From Swiss-Prot:
SUPFAM superfamilies: WD40 repeat-like (SSF50978). Keywords: Cell cycle, Cell division, Cytoplasm, Cytoskeleton, Mitosis, Phosphoprotein, Repeat, WD repeat. It is found in: Cytoplasm, Cytoskeleton, Microtubule organizing center, Centrosome. The modification Phosphothreonine is found at residues 382, 550. Interacts with FAM29A. Interacts with HSPA1A and HSPA1B. Interacts with gamma-tubulin in a HSPA1A/B-dependent manner. During mitosis, prior phosphorylation on Thr-550 by CDK1 promotes subsequent phosphorylation by PLK1 on Thr-382, Ser-397, Ser-426 and Ser-637. Phosphorylated NEDD1 can interact with gamma-tubulin for targeting the gamma-tubulin ring complex (gTuRC) to the centrosome, an important step for spindle formation. This is Protein NEDD1. GO terms for biological process: cell division; microtubule nucleation; mitotic cell cycle. It comes from the Eukaryota. One of its GO terms (molecular function) is gamma-tubulin binding. GO terms for cellular component: apical part of cell; centriole; centrosome; ciliary basal body; cytoplasm; cytosol; fibrillar center; nucleoplasm. Required for mitosis progression. Promotes the nucleation of microtubules from the spindle. Residues 369-411, 507-532 are annotated as: Disordered.
Length: 660
């Protein structure tokens, strides 16, 4: 278990607990509501806590670096009762009694977008794994998916008005799997691509179900609780109930610890039970937490990187640890169930931060991993189609945030983390709450030791597009080329990856990326040269699939050319829809990042599939050769002439014995 990992619970007030000892660390209440606090959410760097009350008086952002201190108040009097942060903690989604879902920009402290598709009170909101969609549920039983990139909402789906949706959660492994619980005790797993039930667990709870939570380390496991005092564990593959426990009191809140082995469950009598999944007969610990019912429990994000996540290295997405992303075993396309932690937010492309060349060159394998970041992984056997649905949408609906938005919101000086051996690194410098600079001197950030081989890097989504000095760019390019030769040993692969990056660059430049005739052209070309190095380093670090060797360069070249051409066309079409010389908004850049990431994932999956097919074909050929060899041995190992001669001699011997 991570040292000093904490969790927060809400009831009549907010309390912060030590996760290992279950002892009280702090308590506070920034709200004036007599009905308690209904929703809480940690920021990605664990330094801030966002809260909303049951009466919807306001949304409060509090600093929890030292003593809890309210810093920011939003939505005063707007009756917002449920909150959720995106993976970068730059945007906050809320819903409440006014039937509205609001997206807040925490830098400007204003409503970024307001969605009024619900007909009744919004009870729960959540972002999906890549922050492109928001799922919200209401008292009327409706579930609506809102696209952040296209500003479109799906047709409401659900089970009817008699089934108020009480809680929604996305699976951490199957990106298109959404779980919901309702008042009539039905637990439903939804396929968000088709907006139809993947499976209904009917009448598993005899009273209203109150919470659902997916395991952060096991792709098959999730748990629900209800007012019938039941804790039920499920298997998503067999669609069966694994185990049912009965507690002493009605249960109201649940969350998994990042290690995946511990559950924290709140009850209507203010108690919190800690269960160990390895011995589920009774709770390991029980504490009296609140005077009223426990309405919400939220664990901090884990900042521990395990060996398995390091081995995965450059697989998909960057670093600390987030509920919405979990490592996937590249060898089998399945999930590596041991030692996986929640991975923290970042963008969809591995972020490259400038590092000293000498230290990077001296670290061997880890040097390339650190250069490319430690990316999040996505599930290769269930690729979500959610982002695909927004690829062809017109970007004209996006709000242009102006030139200053790129520099002010995502400052490269503020967001870039400097990695030094043996030094302490503040976790989450690139967090969305850096809009509070005056607090840095008052509340020093919580320090966490960072080793040279497992450095956790934080940056804003735009760091991959920020320009850097030409000398450093050339050094990064040379280092990447040398590392490439060491790990791949294939000049053809290098050429194919460069071809991909050049096509991306040409497609982007043809889409009117320039904001000024001279200097911005150079900056824009640098923005796309960095992802070229990054893509190459990311694919270099990918371990061999199923222990096989590097794919055939001819196959890789042909697949890469097709993928690159289609990707450049999509990017050019998307950006070309903007008005002339308009700067890219953060949403557009994130959309392009997601598009590139998904294309790389498709390419990686295609390579994996080709290698598996090749191995299967080789096995078939070997089997056919074995059978042919057996038949030839049986056919030619026996000499028919000799056998006939032996039989003739035997008959002759018998005849001679009979006569003489």
């Amino acid at each position: 278990m991570q040292e000093n990992l904490r969790f927060a619970s809400s009831g009549d007030d907010i309390k912060i607990w030590d996760a290992s000892s279950m002892t009280l660390v702090d308590k506070f209440n920034p709200h004036t509501s007599p009905h308690g606090i209904s929703s809480i959410c940690w920021s990605s760097n664990n330094n801030f806590l966002v809260t909303a009350s049951s009466s919807g008086d306001k949304i409060v952002v509090s600093s929890c670096k030292c003593k809890p201190v309210p810093l920011l108040e939003l939505a005063e009097g707007q009756k917002q009762t449920c909150v959720n942060l995106n993976s970068t903690s730059m945007y906050l989604v809320s819903g409440g009694l006014n039937n509205t879902v609001n997206i807040w920009d925490l830098k400007s402290k204003r409503v970024h977008r307001s969605l009024k598709d619900h007909k009744d009170q919004v009870t729960c909101v959540t972002y999906n794994w890549n922050d492109c969609y928001i799922a919200s549920g209401s008292l009327s039983g409706e579930i609506i998916l809102h696209s952040v990139t296209t500003n479109l909402s799906s047709t409401p789906f659900g089970h009817g008005s008699n089934q108020s949706v009480r809680h929604l959660k996305y699976s951490l492994f199957k990106k298109s799997l959404l779980g919901s619980v309702s008042d009539n005790g039905i637990v439903t797993l939804w396929d968000v691509n088709s907006q139809s039930p993947y499976h209904n667990f009917d009448s598993v709870h005899k009273a209203p179900a109150s919470g659902i939570c997916f395991s952060p380390v096991n792709e098959l496991l999730f748990v629900t609780i209800g007012l019938d005092k039941r804790i039920i564990l499920y298997d998503t593959s067999s669609k069966k109930l694994v185990k049912t426990l009965v507690a002493d009191t009605p249960l109201t809140a649940v969350d998994f610890m990042p290690d995946g082995a511990t559950l924290a469950i709140g009850s209507s009598r203010g108690k919190i039970y800690q269960y160990d999944l390895r011995m589920l007969k009774s709770p390991v610990k029980t504490i009296s937490a609140h005077k009223t019912s426990v309405q919400c429990i939220a664990f901090q994000y884990s900042t521990v990187l395990t060996k398995s996540s390091l081995n995965k290295g450059c697989s998909n997405k960057p670093t600390t640890v987030n509920k919405r992303s979990v490592n996937v075993n590249a060898a089998s396309g399945g999930v590596q169930n041991s030692g996986i932690v929640r991975e923290a937010p970042a963008t969809s492309i591995a972020t490259v931060l400038p590092q000293p060349m000498t230290s990077a060159m001296g670290k061997g394998t880890v040097a390339v991993q650190e250069k490319a970041g430690l990316p999040r992984s996505i599930n290769t056997d269930t690729l979500s189609k959610e982002t695909d649905s927004g690829k062809n949408q017109d970007f004209s609906s996006f709000d242009d945030t102006g030139k200053s938005s790129l520099g002010d919101m995502f400052s490269p000086i503020r967001d870039d983390a400097v990695v030094n051996k043996g030094s302490d690194e503040s976790i989450g410098k690139g967090d969305g709450f850096d809009f509070l600079p005056q607090l840095n001197s008052v509340f020093p950030p919580r320090k966490n030791p960072v080793t040279s081989s497992t450095s956790v890097l934080h940056s804003s989504p735009l760091n991959v597009f920020m320009g850097s000095p030409g000398k450093e760019e050339n050094e990064n390019r040379d280092l990447t080329a040398e590392s490439k030769k060491i790990y791949m040993g294939k000049q053809e692969s290098k050429d194919s990856f460069k071809q991909l990056a050049k096509l991306v660059t040409s497609g982007a430049e043809s889409g009117n990326l320039n904001t000024s005739p001279s200097s911005n052209q150079t900056r824009n070309s640098e923005k796309f040269e960095k992802p070229e190095n990054e893509i190459e380093a990311q694919l270099i670090c990918e371990p061999p699939i199923n222990g096989s060797s590097t794919p055939n360069p001819k196959i890789a070249s042909s697949v890469t050319a097709g993928v690159a051409s289609s990707l450049s066309e999509k990017i050019a079409d998307s950006i070309g829809n903007n008005r002339q010389n308009a700067p890219l908004t953060s949403i557009q850049i994130r959309f392009i990042q997601n598009m590139i990431q998904e294309t790389l994932d498709d390419f990686r999956e295609a390579c994996h599939r080709d290698i598996v097919n090749l191995q299967v074909e080789m096995i078939k050929q070997f089997h056919m050769q074995l059978n042919e060899m057996h038949s030839l041995l049986e056919r030619y190992s026996v000499n028919e002439g000799l056998v006939a001669e032996i039989e003739r001699l035997r008959e002759e011997n018998k005849r001679l014995r009979a006569h003489f």
